[in-house]
Amino acid sequence: MTGGETPPFSLAVIADAHFHDIAGDYGLPGVPAGERRLTLYSWARTRESTRVFNESAAALSAALEQVAARGIRHVVLLGDYTDDGQRRTTESLARLLTRQEEEHGLRFYALPGNHDVFGPFGRHRSGDFLRADGRSVLVTSDGREPPPGAVVTPDFRCEGLPAGLLPMARFGYFRRPEFLHWETPFGLNDAPEARSYEAVSADGRTRHRLMDASYLVEPEDGLWLMMIDANVFEPRNGVFKPRSKRAFIDSTAAGWNAMLRLKPFILTWMADVAARAKATGKTLLTFSHYPVIDPLDDREGYEPRLFPGGTILKRRPEPAVAEAVSKAGIDLHFSGHWHVAGQSRRGDLVNVAVPSLCGYPPGFCVVEAKGVAVAVETVDLSALPLDADIMALYGREAARTGGGSDAVSGARDYGEFLRLHTQALVRHRYFPREWPAEVVSAIEGMRLSDLLADERTRPAGDVPPGCDADEAVIALIADWYCLRQGGALALAGLGERRIALLEQLARLYAETPEASTDRAIAAYLGLFFRAGLFHLERARGPAWPAA
């Protein structure tokens, strides 16, 4: 950069913070921990969720500390900034962000994810929280038929649009005097009633006016942030009570596939914004919660063969999405939702998948941009310390319930904790929901030496000496998931020995026929470990820009 050149714009992008206020008041007294009383989700609930709950607030605070220390002022919140859109949680987050504005001069630009709002009317939410004795108690906003002992509070309800945005109003959703420019797909009016569109069910029988929360903001001269509300709450076929959550299809799996059908006006607006940005020399960055290209870049089709009913397949954007977004003049898009770190390309369009703060691997992105020149750095938060009180309470819960703590209480840092959480997910979520039952039954308690010797599971080729490590198979499967989600970040997190073991297994199973019927379990494992080799090659690829 010469002395007369202006520096590039800098901003941080934080996805899927899933903020839960561990000091929040949800109608129960909380668990004593030193001088604190903590409102904590149970470990039994956490190990079945793709995110951790009780560590989210500390991770967000640490991320914002790093942002401020780097001298970055602008922060994009890429959706799912709350735990589950609960009223009290959203209000607590808004207070935290306001303090960050006042103390560090940060400015936040939010867009909604599927966990932040629901349709026009909202929905009830529930969660299992710890008691002091290690048992759990249900907290719910639904008071219709609560189970005995449940805590019922309206503060746990997830709001709809626009009510769910109002606590976060100052963070981009509505105009602020200091913005150099601000608009929506509907014009310059920021009133919710001026930002609605008609959503129609597939059978044409149900119609709703829904708010779209998209906006374009110019926070400093020359920088345009296009914030896309890619939540789609499609009315269901049939007739429902107007305020029933069953009246709308959940936005979780809809994403951009549904955007093309139900919100095509967004693509028209995007094209107009992109053309104006080019004509006026603005640096345009585009964001939405949902990816426009498969973040795993699974061109070989491993996911549909391994997990045909899995969530990844349901959420994958169709090729038409990338075509439409690229046609609108967008060549760079940032997404969250999948809790994946990495990038994927289709033609000139690049999708940057920003990792979650509360899933493996934990991190956020720092972007430097000027014109068409963009640099993206992914900041790894694995080295963050753990809250000793929370770890001790997980141990107390395990001792009380006999359910085990999945070894997380022995984690040395946040990254190791999330890796062990991934291993718990394999046992408590992925195995029962996505894996063939006969495969799980065969391998669940195996060591690697068993896997390579058992007639049902051994690879087709000869096993070389020294490959019978005394490693739990479930730990290796968890490593596979960490590699899939983490890409390059997982290489350092898993370490050379574990990466080498995964690579060796993939090559051992390379000769196992996928279509084998007499050894179907081995065939499935062969496909699984070959997919791991694909994820490994992707992780070792160029970090930026996409090839």
What do the predicted segments below correspond to?
Residues 18-58, 125, 131, 234-259, ...:
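Acidic/histidine-rich helix-loop elements
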Residues 1-90:
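N-terminal active-site segment of His-dependent metallophosphoesterases
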Residues 110, 302-378:
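Conserved beta-sheet core of the metallophosphoesterase superfamily
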Residues 8-21, 223-232, 236, 350-355, ...:
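Active-site-proximal beta-strand elements of phosphoester/diester hydrolases
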Residues 1-9, 267, 276, 299, ...:
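Non-catalytic terminal accessory segments
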Residues 20-21, 83-85, 114-121, 233-236, ...:
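Active-site environment of divalent metal-dependent phosphoester hydrolases
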Residues 92-261, 265-268:
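Extended active-site neighborhood of metal-dependent phosphoesterases/phosphodiesterases
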Residues 46-49, 248-270, 277-331:
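Active-site-proximal segments of metal-dependent phosphoesterases and phosphodiesterases across multiple
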